Amino acid sequence: NVNPPPYYPDHPVVRQEWARYLNSASGMDVRIGWILQQLKKDGVADDTVIVFFGDNGRLEARGIHWCFDSGLHVPMVIHWPANFPAPKGYRAGLVDDRVISLIDLTATTLVMAGLEVPPLMQGQPFLGSEQTSERRFAFSARDRIDETEIRQRSVRGKRFHYVKNFTPGAGFPTLNRYKEKCFLVKPLMRELQAAGK
């Protein structure tokens, strides 16, 4: 018994796929627990920085490969070990609502390792002694994904998200063979669209 996002049709396949996504999140939580247990068992838990993040949104109609929040907003968890002083800005249990781009992660890990961020690097450290002022905007783009060419650009601020679609008329049901096999809602949406639903 699940409630998919409102931009999906109310259909058994949609509910099944959404339940599968929620189950995968639970499974990921269990797997992270296994890794943490192994670090403790190996005696290195208090010496290991843990950074967990997603690289793209969910495999869904507005997720992976799209410039919408469901395709860009990804989880990130950072755990600092007991045997090292925490970097400036880090606090265990902190939920951070700053605008952070994944390009900032490389700059941040360099600073946390005591290294300099190269001047041409676009990322901004969000933790540590070299932490910069809060990023005002994060930018994203989409062009060709497999055989699907849909151009989008977006700007995400703390409060608003602007998405510009340069390919009107080409939407979520557009053919993409990779997603056809992995995401059963995609062919369903194309079928419903063809039927005028």
What is the role of each PLM region?
Residues A141-T148:
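Glycine-rich phosphate/pyrophosphate-binding beta-alpha loops
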Residues A61, T148-I150:
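Short beta-strand-initiation
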Residues Q124-S129, R135-A141:
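Polar, glycine-rich mid-to-C-terminal structural blocks
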Residues N1-L102, T106, L110-L120, V163, ...:
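Active-site-proximal cap/lid insertion segments
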Residues V74-P75, Q124, F137, R153:
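Extracytoplasmic/periplasmic beta-strand context in beta-sandwich domains
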Residues G157-H161:
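Beta-strand-turn-beta hairpins that frame and shape the catalytic cleft
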Residues R62-H65, S129-S133:
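Substrate-binding cleft/loops of secretory-pathway carbohydrate-active enzymes
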Residues I150-R156:
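Short, surface-exposed beta-strand/loop micro-motifs that present aromatic residues
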